[in-house]
């Protein structure tokens, strides 16, 4: 038997740091540098002083995630970090896992691979049935997140706006848990009854997440929130004799434990008495709504509503759940009309910290979720597809989210008006990079001669072995410029939205390798192009006010040259607009601060060195080359797959793994499991390991 505590650690023990009164163990591969120590000190001080809002203004490449990790560790309180999309959330999750390998770092994003909400189009009399595909891997990680919040204090949750959508009531969810301790008096029948109430399924042949099996006085439970760990409960004379964690694939016992808590298999599990109470209130609302339709002479709507609702009531009565049960969430939670639904935010303790990463994007997202959802549901209610109470199954309004905010730190290189209003003067700057790199020098030149001037600048950079990014306003302009530069002997490529992910990676690789020297694009700041070899960013028609030439967009685009020692940005325009003035002023201010810091500490800026070998298919060893090429081909294949195809591929691998296990081919099963983990990690950005809480 392997005791998990005896497994050797891949980390250097001397680099773990702890703080008084904090449950976190922070792994510091390097000490904070540049502006990081001061930013950490100010943020921790502000949190200690009870400040509701602070802003961390961190430039590209300044190590904002590392600063957040240090602040969380020193404050010693649970934290939630919001990200604007799944990709960034996965990146943050991966980084926080590196900094907190011994604490619970969790991932809470939408668990739908595909989601088509139910909707009605009155103009065409078209009803669209709800259709969705739930990703089991992400569902397991969501359950793991709420479990960690209920069990421990050393928790960091990385979430997207999915966290403001309704999930089960925390109080009722907590009431349903089953805690097992060695020596507890409980019969086998009681254990089975409790598991079935928590929506676990008995399955003697196909043992998977959310199921249990019974063999005499031994009950094996595969907890819904675990990916690779099940628990074996051995009873003797109606008493818990022993508890063991084991690998459900190989059956090998991993660890003996004294206590284990089994959580419900879904966030929407509800006690039987609550369901019966809800049935009564749903019937009352149905009668009221039918009376309204009859008075309005809307007989079709009345018949439709009665048929659909009575079918759902029958299912609730017999099974305890029905399709679309979330539309009755107000009745199940006992909330009043218009009350906000329970969300992940309600699972957070009152002293939790909130970090809003890329807050200038995130605030807009949080603001927009409620209105779109409501418009769709009002139509469903008006035409008799749903009861009016379905409108309360919704995301939080922004004002409601604000009311639930804990102490907040906005994190952005370009904070917007909302952050400025809320945080006011409480802005902590992280402008100085640990590498000593400074923001680019900015030149403003006339737009009338922009193409000729750009051509001469490109020739200078090419001679020095450096690369150039050029951003234009329109697709047509980008195509014409690419053609002109090519005719004048410049090795140039054009990056646009029609290029798929794999080709885009190849283009960036070729730019870094020097296969070509100039990359032309329209909205390069969105592409996330952090290429150290780029020493010049040219912004054509910078004086045309608009989304692509707004202050924040200009600052982000200029920042593309911030990873090179010779970084320069040229803004072509016949006048200096207000946005240009602000962007230049802010960049100059940051640059002056960075240079002063370097001079005071004798730091020589050093460029960011990213190994290009990461991209070149193994040149040293033929076998390695073949393996890397196959991995790259698999990765490219997965990138090109639709979400439905990815779901099918995961199911295929899972079936293959279980077939090997049934045939006692455990090495093959483990190999397929590793392949499955790689696929999940690539597609969802997280592999989902189990967090085991040591028995007290």
Swiss-Prot record:
Residues 45-434 form the Helicase ATP-binding domain. It is found in: Cytoplasm. One of its GO terms (cellular component) is cytoplasm. A motif (Beta-hairpin) lies at residues 111-134. GO terms for biological process: nucleotide-excision repair; SOS response. The keyword Nucleotide-binding applies. It comes from the Bacteria. PANTHER family: UVRABC SYSTEM PROTEIN B. This is UvrABC system protein B. The gene is uvrB.
């Amino acid at each position: 038997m392997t005791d998990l505590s005896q497994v050797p650690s891949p980390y250097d023990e001397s680099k773990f740091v702890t703080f008084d009164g904090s449950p976190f163990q922070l792994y510091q591969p390097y000490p904070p540098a540049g502006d990081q120590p001061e930013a950490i000190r100010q943020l921790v001080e502000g949190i200690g002083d009870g400040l509701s809002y602070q802003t961390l203004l961190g430039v590209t490449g300044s190590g904002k995630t590392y600063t957040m990790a240090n602040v969380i560790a020193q404050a010693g309180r649970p934290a939630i970090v919001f990200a604007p999309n799944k990709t960034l959330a996965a990146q943050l999750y991966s980084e926080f896992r590196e900094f907190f390998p011994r604490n619970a770092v969790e991932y809470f994003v939408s668990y739908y691979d595909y989601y088509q909400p139910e909707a009605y189009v009155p103009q065409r009399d078209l009803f669209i049935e709800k259709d969705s595909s739930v990703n089991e891997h992400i569902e397991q990680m969501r359950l793991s997140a709420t479990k960690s919040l209920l069990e421990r204090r050393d928790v960091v949750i990385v979430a997207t706006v999915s966290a403001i959508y309704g999930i089960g009531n925390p109080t009722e969810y907590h009431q349903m848990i089953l805690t097992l301790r060695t020596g507890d008096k409980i019969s086998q029948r009681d254990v089975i009854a409790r598991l079935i109430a928590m929506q676990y399924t008995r399955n003697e042949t196909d043992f998977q997440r959310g199921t249990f099996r019974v063999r005499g006085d031994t009950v094996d439970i595969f907890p819904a929130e675990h990916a690779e760990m099940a628990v074996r409960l051995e009873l003797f004379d109606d008493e818990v004799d022993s508890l063991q964690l084991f690998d459900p694939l190989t059956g090998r016992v991993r660890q003996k434990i004294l206590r284990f808590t089994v959580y419900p298999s879904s966030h929407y599990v509800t006690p039987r008495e609550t369901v019966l109470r809800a049935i009564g209130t749903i019937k009352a609302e149905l009668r009221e709504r039918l009376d309204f339709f009859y008075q309005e002479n809307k007989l079709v709507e009345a018949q439709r509503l009665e048929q659909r609702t009575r079918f759902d009531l029958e299912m609730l009565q017999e099974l305890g759940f029905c399709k679309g049960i979330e539309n009755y969430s107000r009745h199940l939670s006992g909330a009043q009309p218009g009350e906000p639904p329970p969300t992940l935010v309600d699972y957070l303790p009152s002293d939790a910290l909130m970090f809003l990463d890329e807050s200038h994007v995130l605030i807009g997202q949080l603001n927009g979720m409620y209105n779109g959802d409501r418009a769709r549901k009002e139509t469903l209610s008006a035409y008799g597809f749903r009861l009016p109470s379905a409108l309360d199954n919704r995301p939080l309004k922004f004002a409601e989210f604000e009311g639930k905010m804990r102490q907040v730190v906005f994190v952005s290189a370009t904070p917007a008006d909302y952050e400025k209003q809320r945080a006011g003067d409480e802005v902590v700057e992280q402008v100085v990079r640990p590498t000593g790199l400074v923001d680019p020098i900015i030149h403003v030149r006339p737009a009338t001669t922009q193409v000729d001037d750009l051509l001469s600048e490109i020739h200078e950079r090419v001679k020095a072995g450096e690369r150039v990014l050029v951003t234009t306003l329109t697709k047509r302009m980008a195509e014409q410029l690419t053609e002109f530069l090519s005719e004048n002997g410049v090795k140039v490529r054009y990056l646009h939205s029609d290029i798929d992910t794999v080709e885009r990676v190849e283009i960036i690789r070729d730019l870094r390798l020097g296969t070509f020297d100039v990359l032309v694009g329209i909205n390069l700041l969105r592409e996330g192009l952090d290429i150290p070899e780029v020493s010049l960013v040219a912004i054509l028609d910078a004086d045309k006010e608009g989304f692509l030439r707004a202050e924040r967009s200009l600052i982000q685009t200029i920042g593309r040259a911030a990873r090179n020692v010779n970084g320069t940005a040229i803004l072509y325009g016949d006048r200096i607009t207000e946005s240009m003035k602000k962007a230049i002023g802010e960049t100059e201010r940051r640059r002056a601060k960075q240079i002063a810091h370097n001079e005071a500490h004798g730091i020589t800026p050093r460029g960011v060195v990213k190994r290009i070998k990461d991209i070149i298919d193994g040149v040293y060893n033929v076998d390695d080359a073949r393996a890397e090429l196959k991995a790259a081909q698999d990765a490219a294949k997965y990138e090109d797959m639709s979400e439905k195809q990815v779901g099918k591929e995961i199911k295929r691998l899972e079936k293959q793994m279980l077939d090997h296990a049934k045939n006692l081919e455990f090495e093959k099963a483990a190999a397929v499991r590793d392949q499955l983990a790689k696929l999940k990690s690539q597609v969802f950005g997280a592999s989902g390991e189990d967090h085991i809480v040591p028995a007290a």
